[in-house]
Structure formats: C-alpha cells, structure tokens
Swiss-Prot record:
The lineage of its organism: Viruses, Varidnaviria, Bamfordvirae, Nucleocytoviricota, Megaviricetes. It comes from the Viruses. Residues 7-18, 166-252 have a biased composition (Low complexity). This is Uncharacterized protein 074L. Residues 1-38, 166-280, 767-787 are annotated as: Disordered. Belongs to the IIV-6 268L family.
Length: 834
C-alpha cells in the first residue's frame, strides 16, 4: 500500500478539488489498490466557503440604487396605459438621477431596445419590471438571467440608432464618420468585454481538466523528479491547450460578432475609418428587414361561445372550487386605474352596461373561486348555470373591477388590489346570446374599450372647454343654478328661483353665456356663483349673500359679476377677521370651484348627464366646518345708526379711507331723486362709479314687492279659488245626502268682486223632507239650520261656551242641524262624532 504524504513537497501529487463532483480524487501508487477515502474536513471547508461566497455575493451591491430602480419600474407599472413616451420619460429620469454606472448602463441599453429599436415589446418589458421588483438581484445579473447571456451584447441598432439609415446610404460623409468613430469604439469595447467573459469560463474548464490529468499521470511508480517533470509537462501542455482554446474561442466570438458589426469599423493599427463593403451593406439591410418583421400586430377579439341559460336555486355559501381543464396562456396586459381618475358612477356604468360586449346586458353574475368575497357578492341571490351557482354582485364589486389590477387565464379572472387577491369567474346574461362567461378575449376587448373611453372622455371635455358653450351646457347650467338656490335658501326660496324657465334664471344664464369666450370661461363664471351657495361652511346658509337672494335684492344681469367681497363681506370686508380664516376660506372656495368644474363636465357626458334626469340635484356634503364670524356692521364707522338694520339691507361705501353703511332701499331712493347725492357723514358727494355700480346691481324695494304681489295674485289666489270651488261642490253634494253624519263647512277667506271670469259659487241649502201639514192647512217646509244669530248656533256643542259670530269656529251638522265647536279638542271629545 502506498502512503500519503501531506507535506508541502508532495502537494502536486495530492490531486485537486473538482467543481464537478465536489470530491478529492486520490489514486494509490499500486495498480488495482482501493482509492483513499475523501477528506471530509476539506469538503466541509469547501462547502462552507461556497456558501459564504453565495451569501455575500451581492453584499456590495448598491441597495439604495436598487430601490430607486424598483421605484422607477413601479411608477411605470402604475400607468393606466403604458406607452413608449412614459417608459422613455421615467427611464431617462432614472439615468439622470442614478449614480451607479453599471445600473445606468443596463437601463440605457434597455431604453434603446424598447423605445428606439423596439426589439423588446412593451408587454415583455412589463413582465421584466414586475419580475425585477419581486427579487433582490442586481439589474445587470437579473438582466442576463431574464433575457439570456447575450442580452447585453450591443446590436447594430444599439450602436447606430436612428443614424443607421444615413450610414447605409452615404459613402463618405464627414458627419457620419465622426458619429461612427465614437459608436464603433463603444461597440469594440463591449465586444472585447464580451469576449473576455466568454474566455474566462473556458480557461477555468481547461485548468480543471489539466489538474485531473495531472493526478492520473502522478499515479505511476516513477521517481519524484519524473513525477515533477511529468506534472510540469502536463501543465505546459495544458497551458498551450488553454491558449489555443482561448484563441479559437476569441476568433469564434469575433466571427459571430462580425455579422452584427457596423458597416464602418475602426482599424486597430491606426485611427482611420475604412469604408463599407458590399457584404457589410447587405448585412445592415438584413438587420433592418428583421427589425421591421418583428413589429407586434394587435390581436382581434374573438366571438365568445354561447352558453345555455340557468335557473334560480337555493343558498349555498360553501361552494367548491373546480379545477380548470387548462386554457390559453394568461393575458399579459393589465389594467390598473387610480381611484382619483375614475368615479364610482363611471365604474358602475362601465361594469353594469359592459359596452365592449356589443350586446344587451340583462345582468352580471359572479362565481367566487378564491378569496374573501364578503361584501362583494350577495349570497342569497344567485342563479345556477353550468353546474355552478353564480351570485349577484354588490357595489364593492364594481369598485374592485374598476380599481384593481387584472389578468385572465381561461375563464378565471384574477384581481389584485391593496395586496389582496381575488379569483373569480364572471357570467354575463346577454339579450341575444344568453349567458356568456368572460374569457381572455373579452378582457382584451375591455382594456381596449377603456383606453379608448378615457381618451374620448378627455377629448370630449377638451371640446367643451375650447368651443362655444353648447345648448346642453346652457340647459345644465340652469338646472345647476336652480338646484343650488333651492339647496341654499331651503323652504323660503322665492318662486322665481324654482323653475329653469323663469325670467330670472334665464337672464342670469344668458348673461353668463354672452360674456364667455368659450366653455371653460362659461363654467368658471358659473362656478363663481354656485360655490357661494353650496360651499361646505357652517355660516353660508345665513350669509348676507343668501339673505339678499332671498329678498331678491340683486338684479339678474349683474349677479354673475359680483366679486368675492360682494358675496361674502363677512370675510373679505371686515377688518378684524384673522388671516388664517381668510386663507382657509379662499382655499375652500378654490377647492369647491375645481370640484364643481370636474363634476359639471362629467355630467355633460352622455352616460351620466343630468339633462336626462333634471330632478336630481347636484349636492355636496352637509355643512360641517365651523367658522366664527363677527357682526359685519362692526366695520361701519356709523354702526350706531345702522344697528337696527338687517344685515342683508346694508351696503358699504368707502369714503376717505373709512367704511360707511347705508340702507340699500334708502340709498336707492336717494340716488333716484337727487342729481348729486351727498354723503351725510362727510358732506362729500358719492362717486359716480359707486352710483353706477349700485343702480345696476340692486333692485328697488317697491319693485320687489310688486313682483311678489303679482306672483301671488296670478298663481296663489287662482289655486285657492279652484280649491274653494271644489270644496263648495263637495259640501253641496253632502248636504243633499239623506242623513249626513259629519260635515265641516268650508269657510272662505278670499274676497273678490264678481267679474266676467269669476262668478261666486252659490251654495245650496239643505231642505228637509216635507212634514205633514195641519188639517186644512198647506204643507210646511221646515229649515233644520239654526239662523246665524240664534243662541243654539253660537254655542259650542261640547263645552257650551258662547262663540262669537266673527270668530273662526268649527261648523258641522248633527241630526240635520247645524252645530258649532269652539276648537278641535271639543269636536274630538264629543261622543256624537267619535
């Protein structure tokens, strides 16, 4: 048996550690003798070193830059529609912000392949970014693992870019020569680096094989010197083989790269640029042709299969999940929409009507596969179809469909939102094809429709903003203004504010229309008026502006042009208002203007227009914000003289840097009666500008009263007249009855003189049956009603309290006699009328 010597002199005969079988190979000096056992200590050391190496392999990677790149990919994935412009914008921003050159180089190469050469489709880029965010490898290593080992090798397009066509068409252009020089040097450096990476594993493999050959040759019984010479000879042969292999590999790599090399390259001996050869031109044309053939053709949606209808059944919350029998590959495109861009109303419209199905939608049903569907479906309402129970969805289902990220595999839809995942199947009850289960093609059609819908929605709003206001905008403005006035003024709203066809509302909207350049300015002027009626502040219902509108002080022609100080003097006129309060109110007003503008344009859309539903008002939340405001008359220098005046009757006038308050009606009369009105407190005449603004803004009090009286005469009194005639007719019919049990006679409150179109109704008097006359006498007609002045007719039937003839008592009939009660309590207590 040969002995093993562990001294340093015999290290060459011990063999080497092989990376293939991870064992120490030792041969005995005698042929046929058993091999020595592997040294377990060395094996354990080797394994621990490899584990430690793998553990700390990426320890020096820049974690902060890795996180920055993940955030950049996340921004791109959050786009509703991922476009090349969005990819270029975000990746360019990352390259500028990043300080890690290896990361930036890979991202720059990725940008060229996606945006310029288009060798990497957008769908594959989305998958790459999603996979990169779910792991911790550096971008250069993960890039090679994902796209292959040759992913970082530059192509002709990577080197030349958009100048490729110029290079192929020009022979000796100086500008092209300069560009080619720099680009070729980049390609040469990248090519040499790639060749160096290809040579390294070859050298390692050859060294390993040489070591094993040295071990096998050292097993002979030659002397130590012969073993050393043999080992040296083997090493030299191995080195020569390695050199030859490396040279061969290098030449092979250069041959491979030559097919992708540019048409003009730099000479290694000098810095001159040689011209293109015909073979190189042919290769460039071939590359361009391949790039054109790789363009993605959009896939058209297929017609879904018609499924038979189902029948309703009982409740079963313990549903079983059946495995799918396989299906097409999952749809790569996803739909992720931020909450702020799509309203709940639009979500319900899209996923209730399903316009991309191109059919009448009767109902939508959901079959839960996996996930918590509490609050998403109604377990007590379902149908049975295809051996499954399909449930009615709730409102949360439409929100989940609209705001989640979705993918489809076969008939199973996967929705992810806020880190939660739901798997379900969607059945659509159509009018012509029966029940259809959603598949991949339907999801593709859905995404295409939503992308077009968003674009058309933005174009739709842009058309409204840039063009002249349409008739729909004018009609919607009237509806919005009427609803805002009714919401602000409540039950005390005047009649002129209740109808969209009233002269006041039409005048206000027409004034806004005439002074608007386009739809944007039209909505802006309207919002300046509406937000002061519907703003979410506690004092708005009792503001001076609302009180003046209730009193109809403003003229409709000047109402749209009131300033913020005119509509809210409590905040913008009073001096001792805190600056924080003013700032808060200004921000709140602008917030309400923005919200109103967005909602106004949304309501103009066909699918959610209020023109089809004019009775539905535009309402905001109830007032919740409390703002403490002082008395607005504290700003007046003559506040003692106007202390008893109502806030809505007070107007402000600035004279000599002092604010004076006046009654609006007294001032109106003064301006009408006097050519040069004088301020009684300063003895200075009022300015012409103030007089003109005042006379064109406010209406006189007699005019307001005249309008109110006219409205009451033409509307209210006519209604009362018709009611009185109807009550008189009913009363006369009851009086003619044989034995009426209870009659309350209507007492008129209207006093009118007879005219051609009004004739007072003559009431009938009930005549009792003819009583027998005494013998020899004529028949006697007996009147059952007490005369108005009799004692029986002026006494309460219950409490016997005398009732004045002029008082408003309650009259009735009991046993063919007229009776009276002093109040309803006596009437209810009386046994005859219970």
């Amino acid at each position: 048996m040969g002995s093993l010597d562990y001294s340093s002199k015999n290290n060459s005969s011990l063999g080497s550690i092989s990376s293939d079988d991870e064992s120490i190979v030792l041969d005995n000096e005698n042929n046929g003798a058993p091999k020595a056992q592997p040294r377990t200590t060395l094996l354990q050391l080797k394994k621990s070193l490899e584990a430690d190496y793998k553990k700390n392999l990426y320890k020096n990677a820049d974690g902060q830059d890795h996180l920055l790149l993940q955030n950049t990919f996340r921004k791109i994935l959050n786009y509703g529609t991922i476009t090349l412009d969005a990819v270029k914008k975000e990746l360019t921003t990352y390259i500028q912000d990043s300080e890690n050159e290896p990361y930036s180089a890979v991202v720059r190469s990725l940008l060229v392949k996606v945006v310029e050469s288009k060798t990497i489709p957008v769908d594959r880029l989305v998958d790459f970014m999603t996979a990169f965010n779910g792991q911790s490898l550096p971008i250069d290593i993960f890039y090679k693992k994902y796209f292959g080992p040759d992913a970082l090798k530059p192509t002709v397009w990577d080197v030349f870019g958009s100048s490729l066509s110029d290079l192929s068409s020009s022979d000796s252009d100086s500008s092209s020569t300069t560009t080619t020089t720099s680009d070729t040097s980049i390609w040469s450096d990248s090519s040499s680096a790639s060749a160096q990476r290809n040579r390294s594993p070859t050298r390692s493999t050859r060294s390993s094989r040489s070591s094993r050959s040295s071990i096998r040759s050292s097993s002979s019984t030659s002397s130590r010197s012969s073993r050393s010479s043999s080992s040296s000879s083997s090493s030299s042969n191995s080195s020569s083989d390695t050199t030859s292999s490396s040279s061969s590999s290098s030449s092979s790599s250069e041959d491979d790269d030559e097919s992708k090399a540019p048409a003009m390259v730099q000479s290694p001996t000098n810095n001159k640029i040689r011209e293109f050869t015909p073979q190189e031109r042919q290769r460039i044309e071939l590359v361009k042709e391949r790039a054109e053939n790789k363009k993605i053709v959009p896939r058209e949606a297929k017609v879904v299969q018609v499924q038979p209808g189902g029948k309703p059944g009982g409740v079963d919350v313990n549903f079983a999940t059946r495995q799918s029998s396989g299906g097409p590959s999952p749809v790569k495109r996803t739909f992720s929409d931020p909450v702020s861009s799509t309203s709940q109303k639009d979500c319900e419209f899209l996923y209730k009507k399903l316009p991309w199905v191109k059919d009448i939608i009767n109902h939508v049903y959901v079959y839960p596969v996996r996930g918590n569907f509490e609050g998403i479906i109604e377990y007590d309402k379902f149908i049975e179809h295809d051996g499954r129970k399909w449930y009615h969805p709730k409102e949360q289902y439409y929100t989940l469909q609209c705001m989640g990220t979705k993918s489809q595999r076969g008939k199973t839809l996967t929705i992810t939102r806020d880190g939660k995942t739901w798997k379900l199947m969607v059945a659509i009850d159509t009018g012509t094809r029966g029940i259809v289960v959603q598949n991949e093609d339907m999801l593709t059609a859905e995404l295409d429709y939503i992308r077009t819908w968003k674009t058309s929605k933005n174009d739709h709003i842009r058309d409204f903003m840039e063009n002249v206001p349409t008739a729909d905008m004018v009609q919607l403005a009237k509806i919005v203004l009427v609803n805002a006035l009714q919401d602000s003024l409540g039950a005390t709203v005047p009649l002129v504010y209740k109808s969209t066809t009233s002269p006041f509302i039409e005048t206000v909207v027409d004034t806004i229309f005439k002074n608007s350049k386009n739809g944007e300015s039209f909505v802006r002027i309207l919002s300046n008026l509406v937000v002061f009626l519907t703003i979410n502040l506690s004092f708005i219902s009792s503001s001076v502006f609302a009180k003046r509108l209730r009193r109809q002080i403003y003229l409709p022609e000047t109402l749209p042009f009131l300033t913020d100080a005119d509509k809210l003097p409590e905040v913008f006129v009073v001096k001792n208002i805190p600056e924080n309060t003013k700032k808060f109110v200004v921000e709140k007003l602008e917030e309400e203007r923005t919200s109103f503008t967005r909602q106004f344009y949304d309501n103009l859309r066909i699918d959610s227009s209020l023109i089809r539903k004019p009775t539905k008002p535009i309402l905001w939340n109830k007032p919740t914000t409390q703002v403490e405001l002082p008395d607005i008359k504290t700003v007046c220098k003559n506040r003692n003289d106007v202390q008893d005046e109502q806030d809505e009757d007070v107007v402000y006038y600035t004279d000599m840097n002092e604010i004076y308050c006046f009654n609006v009606y007294k001032l109106w009369s003064l301006f009408r009666q006097t050519d040069t009105p004088i301020n009684p407190y300063t003895s200075r005449p009022f300015t012409d500008q103030f007089i003109q603004i005042f006379l064109t803004r406010y209406a006189s009090k007699p005019l307001v009263r005249k309008i109110e009286n006219l409205t009451k005469t033409t509307a209210t009194s006519r209604l009362e007249e018709l009611i009185e005639r109807e009550l008189s007719l009913i009363e006369n019919n009851l009086i003619e009855a044989e034995n009426p049990t209870f009659i309350q006679k209507y007492k008129t409150t209207i006093t009118q003189t007879p005219s051609d179109d009004y004739l007072p109704v003559q009431g009938k008097r009930r005549i009792s049956r003819v009583t027998p006359s005494p013998p020899g006498g004529a028949t006697k007609v007996r009147e059952n009603f007490h005369p108005p002045g009799s004692a029986a007719g002026n006494t309460c039937m219950e409490c016997r309290t005398p009732i004045e003839p002029s008082s408003d008592g309650i009259m009735s009939v009991f046993r063919n006699k007229m009776v009276r009660f002093c109040s309803y309590d006596c009437l209810e207590r009386n046994k005859a009328f219970k």
